[in-house]
A protein has these predicted regions:
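Short, contiguous, helix-prone interaction/anchoring segments in small proteins
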Residues: 26-46
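Long, contiguous binding/interaction regions
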Residues: 92
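Short alpha-helical DNA-recognition segment
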Residues: 40-60
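N-terminal flexible/basic segments that precede or flank functional cores
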Residues: 1-33
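DNA major-groove recognition helix of helix-turn-helix/homeodomain DNA-binding modules
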Residues: 70-87
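Residue-level detection of the helix-turn-helix DNA-binding "recognition helix"
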Residues: 63-64
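Charged, alpha-helix-enriched surfaces in structured cytosolic catalytic cores
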Residues: 30, 68-71
């Protein structure tokens, strides 16, 4: 199954990202790749323009070797209709 078979709207994208956060080892790699996969499910130009980044920057920042700034992550998520929410950690 391809990611674009699962990502149909903002809600399914949020579910996908939340699952990837659970699988992430703490280095952000799973989340970064997940955001990259969601970007590919959209028209990349429609994400790049409101996020004020180039298409090439998007592909570069959200691949396995990417290292996007927190600001870029927020702008890209907002351009996709998503946001970040902080919750208390369970069983710390």
């Amino acid at each position: 199954m391809d990611v674009d078979d699962f990502i149909r709207d903002d809600k399914s994208a949020a579910v996908f990202l939340n699952e990837m956060i659970k699988l992430d080892s703490g280095d952000g790699s799973m989340v970064r790749l997940a955001i990259g996969n969601i970007i590919k499910c959209h028209n990349v130009s429609e994400i790049a323009k409101p996020a004020c980044v180039s298409r090439a920057s998007l592909y570069s920042a959200f691949n396995k070797d990417g290292n996007p700034s927190f600001d870029m992550v927020q702008k890209v998520l907002a351009a996709m209709g998503l946001g970040i929410q902080f919750v208390p950690l369970e069983n710390r």
